[in-house]
């Protein structure tokens, strides 16, 4: 990573250009947070190792300690390109049955314009370890009104989060490994089969 720049709001960003496969790593230092990412990694292990290296070095170079930590997140993102009404696709695919279906399919409804579910659960008794899933559409009211859609990414985000100060302290590396394991399990057993695949199949069918 050799591209270093400062954003208008003051953040420092270190990144690399896309390789032949579209992979790209980046690191951002905000006033109150360290953020890093690996876009389209060759495998999830590469992304995990990148995170481990950064989290191992950060406390020494930035003089960080347990009192500086609020929470650590591991986020998996899945992008599905779709040229159409993202909100309608989500409504038809994930909310076609159940009590909420009556709201979305009522005879007075002409279009779904904002269907972006955001769900969170605790996976620990102390509620310090949490998992969230969020679906983000990128369809505007103008596109729906004119029926002229751009091909854009419908995004599904899976977040595993751990808060500090509730249970016994652990190192950043240990927490990162634990959160990565949780995210891997949730992605493989729940998010991909229950959310990503149904949406991908609906897009492929031309819904």
Tell me the role of every PLM-derived stretch.
Residues 1, 54-62, 179, 183-191:
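Hydrophobic, Leu/Ile/Phe/Ala-enriched alpha-helical segments that form helix-helix packing faces
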Residues 25-41, 68-77, 152-164:
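Glycine-rich, often proline-containing surface loops adjacent to acidic residues and nearby aromatics
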Residues 1-31, 35, 200-206:
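N-terminal low-complexity, intrinsically disordered segments
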Residues 69-149, 157:
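Aromatic/basic-lined ligand-recognition segments
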Residues 66-68, 194:
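A generic structural motif
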Residues 155-207:
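C-terminal structured interaction module
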Residues 19-23, 58, 138-143:
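Short amphipathic beta-strand starts and helix->beta connectors
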Residues 26-64:
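Hydrophobic alpha-helical segments and helix pairs
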């Amino acid at each position: 990573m050799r591209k270093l720049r400062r954003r208008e709001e003051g953040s420092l960003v270190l990144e690399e250009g896309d390789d032949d496969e579209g992979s790209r790593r980046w690191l951002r230092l905000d006033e109150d947070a360290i953020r890093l990412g690996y876009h389209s990694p060759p495998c999830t292990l590469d992304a995990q190792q990148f995170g481990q290296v950064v989290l191992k070095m950060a406390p020494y170079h930035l003089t960080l300690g347990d009192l500086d930590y609020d929470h650590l997140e591991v986020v998996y993102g899945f992008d599905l390109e779709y040229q159409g009404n993202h909100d309608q696709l989500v409504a038809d695919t994930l909310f076609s049955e159940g009590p909420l279906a009556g709201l979305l399919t009522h005879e007075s409804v002409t279009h779904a314009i904002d269907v972006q579910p955001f769900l969170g659960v605790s996976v620990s008794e102390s509620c310090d370890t949490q998992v969230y899933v969020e679906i983000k559409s990128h369809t505007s009211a103008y596109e729906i009104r004119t029926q002229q859609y751009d091909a854009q990414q419908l995004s599904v985000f899976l977040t595993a989060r751990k808060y500090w100060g509730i249970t016994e302290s652990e190192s950043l590396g240990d927490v990162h490994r634990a959160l990565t394991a949780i995210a891997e399990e949730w992605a493989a057993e729940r998010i991909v089969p229950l959310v990503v695949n149904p949406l991908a199949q609906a897009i492929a069918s031309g819904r």
